Amino acid sequence: MNDFGARTRRLLRGRRAEASGRDAEDIAAAALAREGWAVLARRARTPAGEIDLVAERAGLVAFVEVKARPSLREAAFALGARQRARLVAAAECWVAANPGHGPAGIRFDVVIVAADGTARRIADAFRVGD
């Protein structure tokens, strides 16, 4: 019985986290659109992993990782080296599958979203090889 209860709690926690992540992605996509970015893809799946948002403005493609945390301070430290490497690999797959985008280059942004809906975008948050 305890094992069943633990699995149920994990499942519910996972569903809440997914819903929170989707809400944060909605907030991030709206913020990008207000700044003139066209959101090309949401939750883009590639062989190397998923990209939360892919956006383009003036020929520049931004691969955006969205992080939802209780506070902006906590979210700012939520992207580790392994996640950065995964995002770079996923971006390479996306570019290969979507030729013609990004003639002005690509970059990696992070949008951090606090529980109160406050969002902050860190443009060019890291570079390949960081």
Residue spans for each PLM region:
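Acidic-basic catalytic patches of nuclease active cores, encompassing PD-(D/E)XK
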Residues: 1-42
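Domain-level recognition of nuclease-like catalytic cores that cleave nucleotide substrates
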Residues: 3-5, 98-130
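Short beta-strand or tight-loop elements
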Residues: 35-36, 47-51, 104-106
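Conserved catalytic cores of phosphodiester-cleaving nucleases, focusing on short active-site segments
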Residues: 51-75, 87
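A generic beta-sheet turn/junction motif
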Residues: 46-48, 57-59, 115
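Mg2+/Mn2+-dependent nuclease catalytic core
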Residues: 70-93, 97
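Hydrophobic residues on conserved beta-strands that form the core of alpha/beta folds
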Residues: 39-41, 63, 108
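Protein kinase-like catalytic core scaffold
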Residues: 49, 60-62, 109, 120
